[in-house]
Amino acid sequence: MATGDDSFLWDQDSILSRDLFSATSAELCYENLNRSCVRSPYSPGPRLILYAVFGFGAVLAVCGNLLVMTSILHFRQLHSPANFLVASLACADFLVGLTVMPFSTVRSVEGCWYFGEIYCKLHTCFDVSFCSSSIFHLCFISVDRYIAVSDPLIYPTRFTASVSNKCITFSWLLSISYGFSLIYTGASEAGLEDLVSALTCVGGCQLAVNQSWVFINFLLFLIPTLVMITVYSKIFLIAKQQAQNIEKMSKQTARASDSYKDRVAKRERKAAKTLGIAVAAFLLSWLPYFIDSFIDAFLGFITPTYVYEILVWIAYYNSAMNPLIYAFFYPWFRKAIKLTVTGKILRENSSTTNLFPE
């Protein structure tokens, strides 16, 4: 939910730019326009490095999440309610990499917004909506893993395709409704009209959000976060108990049904562990930004610009992390990537390829 200059905070670059507006030596975003924002680009060396780092994140988010979606949707063996939820999460991260990160890269490096007022608002809406969607998806995924680990044998009857579709629909509808209502109703700027007018300039894309909406935004992050932490704490305890039971049973002669249950439980615990790492990565990426945005709004926006930019891009990079996590922990994903990049998925009946060799 952060876009730097079009985030839930006042764009600190823009605020500093206004302070320098009267300086005749300042470089402007639009040299021939009145009320132009001050441009504050980096020197050539750091500029090239920043473009490379930010651009790599955007490319990785787009390509990595596209591979996740392609793998799950193409290979029939991956067609499950839980995996469709993961594919929908990948779609949200893919859209962050496609519609948000490239434009934020230019803004962060050049210090100006060159993409017009209309896309400024859309960019902010996309940022808020897609990042909110990621939060809700991860929350539902954690609940799914809890059901799978707590009782793996009846799990298929509880988390059905219908339940998965409802979770996906809720995640997208709520996040998009929230994002667009926040930006286009103007409610977030209530009480800040004079400040907005004073800080508006050509080449800027800042969003003012009053304390009430900052608090609402923080709650929309905090509540799902608490759910995820609680659920994964329970998953950890259940997994520990199951491991102890399996160790005891290994010393005895187990029935075939018990052996099957153990195999299913082991598989579900591994999936829960992998997705738990994805949730932990999400929290580590986004928690610093949300804490800063909440505190900053009530202390007069005191965060230094460079600190704010670092927090924003750490959060953005989360959209590129999940495919790396899947590739590291899931052999089936590595095999699916190999089949995709080599073009073998274009072959007839490739969708029936066995990705889980015994």
Curated annotation (Swiss-Prot):
The chain crosses the membrane at residues 48-68, 84-104, 122-143, 167-187, 213-233, 275-295, 310-333. Its main location: membrane. Residues 69-83, 144-166, 234-274, 334-358 are cytoplasmic. One of its GO terms (cellular component) is plasma membrane. Pfam families: 7tm_1 (PF00001). Glycans are attached at residues 34, 210. It is found in: Cell membrane. Disulfide bonds join 37-201, 120-205. InterPro entries: GPCR_Rhodpsn, GPCR_Rhodpsn_7TM, TAAR, TAAR_fam. Olfactory receptor specific for N,N-dimethylalkylamines trace amines. Trace amine compounds are enriched in animal body fluids and act on trace amine-associated receptors (TAARs) to elicit both intraspecific and interspecific innate behaviors. Ligand-binding causes a conformation change that triggers signaling via G(s)-class of G alpha proteins (GNAL or GNAS). One of its GO terms (molecular function) is trace-amine receptor activity. Belongs to the G-protein coupled receptor 1 family. It comes from the Eukaryota. Specifically expressed in neurons of the olfactory epithelium. Signal peptide: none annotated. It is a multi-pass membrane protein. Residues 1-47, 105-121, 188-212, 296-309 are extracellular. The gene is Taar7e. Disruption phenotype: Mice lacking Taar2, Taar3, Taar4, Taar5, Taar6, Taar7a, Taar7b, Taar7d, Taar7e, Taar7f, Taar8a, Taar8b, Taar8c and Taar9 show no visible phenotype or behavioral deficits. They however show an absence of aversion to low concentrations of amines such as 2-phenylethylamine, isopentylamine, N-methylpiperidine and cadaverine. The lineage of its organism: Eukaryota, Metazoa, Chordata, Craniata, Vertebrata. This is Trace amine-associated receptor 7e. In addition to the well known disulfide bond common to G-protein coupled receptor 1 family, trace amine-associated receptors (TAARs) contain an unique disulfide bond (Cys-37-Cys-201) connecting the N-terminus to the extracellular Loop 2 (ECL2), which is required for agonist-induced receptor activation. Keywords: Cell membrane, Disulfide bond, G-protein coupled receptor, Glycoprotein, Membrane, Receptor, Transducer, Transmembrane, Transmembrane helix. PROSITE patterns: G_PROTEIN_RECEP_F1_1, G_PROTEIN_RECEP_F1_2. It comes from Mus musculus.
